[in-house]
Swiss-Prot record:
This is Phospho-N-acetylmuramoyl-pentapeptide-transferase. Belongs to the glycosyltransferase 4 family. MraY subfamily. The keyword Transferase applies. It is found in: Cell inner membrane. The lineage of its organism: Bacteria, Pseudomonadati, Chlorobiota, Chlorobiia, Chlorobiales. The gene is mraY. Its main location: membrane. It is an enzyme of class 2 (transferase). Catalyzes the initial step of the lipid cycle reactions in the biosynthesis of the cell wall peptidoglycan: transfers peptidoglycan precursor phospho-MurNAc-pentapeptide from UDP-MurNAc-pentapeptide onto the lipid carrier undecaprenyl phosphate, yielding undecaprenyl-pyrophosphoryl-MurNAc-pentapeptide, known as lipid I. PROSITE patterns: MRAY_2. It catalyses: UDP-N-acetyl-alpha-D-muramoyl-L-alanyl-gamma-D-glutamyl-meso-2,6-diaminopimeloyl-D-alanyl-D-alanine + di-trans,octa-cis-undecaprenyl phosphate = di-trans,octa-cis-undecaprenyl diphospho-N-acetyl-alpha-D-muramoyl-L-alanyl-D-glutamyl-meso-2,6-diaminopimeloyl-D-alanyl-D-alanine + UMP.
């Protein structure tokens, strides 16, 4: 909204200084700084409020070191969501579907996560919101995004062919499978981020790194010259997604101020599901959904460790009568906890892995 106001003032009075409002880099930086300041200013008040009302119990199955931690207020994802929504509302073109689809995704899955946290912490419902209800929420969001892209003529490029990373002339046409693909990606990534949210600063830090990568690709995809040169799909209006992504980056960084070890608050499903859905929708909007598993490699590894653990346990129990495990505990970060690694060391090493995945995704721009 601030963008429209400043543009209106500039159109009337022609202030040279206000011309910067037309530059994506300026508005992306402004949105990022705004999101950071909002989290830093509101964070202490939200933490104080939630400490009196919303305390997350430590799971019984958690590693011994994890159970020693003091109980913390949850639903910290509300801070991320508020900072993101307000900064984007101020600096982005909110009438663009590339912007409001991400805003809706964050609000929608944030609401699903909030309900889960509320049931677990306030109503003391073991397990919180049933898994199939979460799945319904994810599927409904996927249907909204997929069907809107399918029927809106301005977004026709999204449902057409997409490029394949590492292959210069290889493309895939989803055809009638576009909407199911959208549903799968949103469900998979939102669950992956949710699984990763198990240590102080882990999900927020790795998410911030992934959003930096998405911001870069969004900026390139929104520029016809860069997109053509780099052989990636050109997305008309896709540059606005860079503003959205940078707001998410700094909302996560601001949250890390309070969530780094020892954490004062945790994001809960309110934050993890919102961040995961935003990551998926952004990748879909800039036609980088096939690159997302690499860019979000840490989340993929965490999910893979859980799937592999469950499948191997069931397989060995069926074959031998006794289930065996590959990892000491899944997701993967708990495996390293049980091996005696300090929590800070696990988190920082996972951040380093996230940076490596981010750099590898950048390499695909030329390795084609």
């Amino acid at each position: 909204m601030l963008y429209y106001f400043l543009k209106y003032i500039n159109d009337i009075y022609h202030f040279p200084a206000l011309r910067v409002i037309d530059y994506l880099t300026f508005r992306a930086s402004a949105a990022a700084i705004t999101a950071l300041l909002i989290t830093l200013l509101i964070g202490p008040k939200l933490i104080a409020y939630l400490k009196q009302r919303i305390i997350e119990p430590i799971k019984e199955e958690a590693p011994p070191e994890h159970r020693k931690k003091k109980q913390l207020p949850t639903m910290g994802g509300l801070l991320i969501i508020f900072a993101f929504e307000l900064s984007v509302f101020l600096w982005a073109k909110v009438d663009s579907p590339h912007v409001w689809l991400v805003m809706v995704a964050v609000l929608w899955m944030g609401a699903v996560g909030f309900l889960d946290d509320y049931l677990k912490v306030v109503k003391k419902v073991k397990g919180g919101l049933a898994a199939h209800y979460k799945l319904i929420g994810q599927v409904l969001l996927g249907l909204l995004v997929g069907l809107y892209a399918w029927f809106d003529p301005s977004m026709a490029v999204l449902r057409d062919t997409t490029t394949v990373p590492f292959f210069k002339n290889l493309t895939i046409n989803y055809g009638i499978f576009y909407v199911p693909v959208v549903i799968f990606i949103i469900t998979a990534i939102s669950n992956a981020v949710n699984l990763t949210d198990g240590l102080d600063g882990l999900a927020a830090g790795t998410s911030a790194i992934a959003f930096i990568g998405l911001a870069g690709f969004a900026y390139l995809a929104g520029n016809a010259v860069y997109a053509t040169y780099l052989n990636i799909p050109f997305i008309q209006g896709g540059g606005e997604v860079a503003i959205v992504s940078m707001a998410l980056v700094m909302a996560c960084v601001g949250f890390l101020w309070f969530n780094s070890n020892p954490a004062e608050i945790i994001m809960g499903d309110t934050g993890s599901l919102a961040l995961g859905s935003a990551m998926a929708v952004i990748a879909l909007l800039i036609k980088q959904e096939l690159l997302l598993p690499l860019m979000a490699g840490v989340f993929v590894l965490e999910t893979f460790s859980v799937s592999l653990q469950v499948l191997y346990f069931k397989y060995t129990r069926k074959r031998t009568g006794e289930g065996k495990r590959i990892f000491l505990m899944a997701p993967l970060h708990h495996h390293f906890q049980l091996k005696g690694w300090a929590e800070q060391k696990i988190v920082i090493r996972f951040w380093i892995m996230a940076i490596l995945f981010f750099l590898a995704s950048l390499m695909t721009l030329k390795l084609r």
